[in-house]
A protein has these predicted regions:
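Short, contiguous clusters of charged residues that form electrostatic/catalytic patches at enzyme active sites
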Residues: 9-16, 126-133, 204
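Conserved proline-anchored active-site loop of SAM-dependent methyltransferases
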Residues: 14, 28-41, 50-55, 215-231
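S-adenosyl-L-methionine
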Residues: 1-32, 37-45, 58-60, 67
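Class I S-adenosyl-L-methionine-dependent methyltransferase module
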Residues: 47, 51-193, 226-232
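Conserved SAM-binding strand-loop segment of SAM-dependent methyltransferases
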Residues: 198-205
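Residue-level recognition of the N-termini of beta-strands and the immediately preceding loop/turn
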Residues: 26-27, 148, 152, 199
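Short, basic, glycine/proline-bearing loop/turn elements
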Residues: 24-27, 187-197
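Short conserved loop adjoining the S-adenosyl-L-methionine
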Residues: 208-214
Length: 232
């Protein structure tokens, strides 16, 4: 995911430091998780506690860190005959999504040309809205477990930057269409590493959470500036 401060390219460097100085550690706490890339990576070796005050980050954590095995979506298969929710959303023709009510088109009404902005194309915004509403409908109808729900939300969130018309943050959009926006929006098939440990994800103020949990390794990667990350 393209996100300010993402540490994906530094994971091996962080691992080198961790294994050099904390050889006997059993747990790893990522108190400002962001894209959850660090916690997701260290789940291979540790029981992971992840946290972020931003709810989108919490969804990424719940869907890939606290969730300890790839969801099967058994109820969606049995009740709806949909073998793969990701294939269902990714392969559906955009014209089939036009039945979605206007009041449920949050992304199209606020972040596409139909809403006077150019963060997303109209068609990709509609694809996001359709998937988001359908996931909520399935959850309401008890067709999704908690892990399945958050996995799908995480898969949706992870796909948005790949079609967004931005330079790096959502503070502003390009005044022309970037080449990536021509691609069809797709939910991302996210890996889920099974470590059979009690991994936990939180959506709290990190300074307060540290008073309630304990662990061996504390990884701190706080915000870099005073600007709120949510608008980005």
């Amino acid at each position: 995911m393209r996100y300010i401060g993402c540490k994906t390219q530094l994971l091996e460097n962080i691992k080198e430091v961790v294994f050099k100085h904390a050889k006997d550690a059993k747990s790893f706490c990522d108190i400002f998780s962001g894209t959850a890339s660090v916690g997701r990576y260290f789940k291979q070796w540790f029981e992971v506690y992840s946290n972020d005050l931003l709810y989108f980050s919490y969804c990424l954590q719940k869907g890939t860190i606290e969730c300890d095995k790839k969801p099967t979506f058994s109820r969606v298969k049995m009740e709806l005959g949909i073998q793969s929710p990701l294939d269902f959303f990714n392969n559906m023709d955009s014209s089939s999504m036009e039945k979605l009510e206007q009041e449920k088109r949050f992304f199209q009404n606020n972040y596409s040309p139909k809403g006077g902005r150019m963060y997303l194309t109209d068609s990709n915004a509609l694809r996001i809205d359709f998937a988001r509403n359908k996931i909520e409908e399935w959850e309401k109808n008890k067709l999704l477990s908690k892990d399945e729900y958050f996995y799908l939300i995480a898969a949706l969130v992870e796909g948005i930057p790949f079609v967004s018309n931005i330079a790096g943050t959502y503070g502003a959009f390009h005044k022309f269409w970037d080449a990536r926006t021509a691609k069809r929006f797709c939910l991302i098939d996210l890996p889920v590493f099974t470590n059979k440990k009690n991994n936990l994800s939180f959506n709290e103020d990190g300074t307060q959470l540290l008073k309630k949990i304990s662990g061996d390794i504390l990884y701190i990667d706080p915000p870099y500036n005073e600007r709120q990350y949510l608008p980005n």
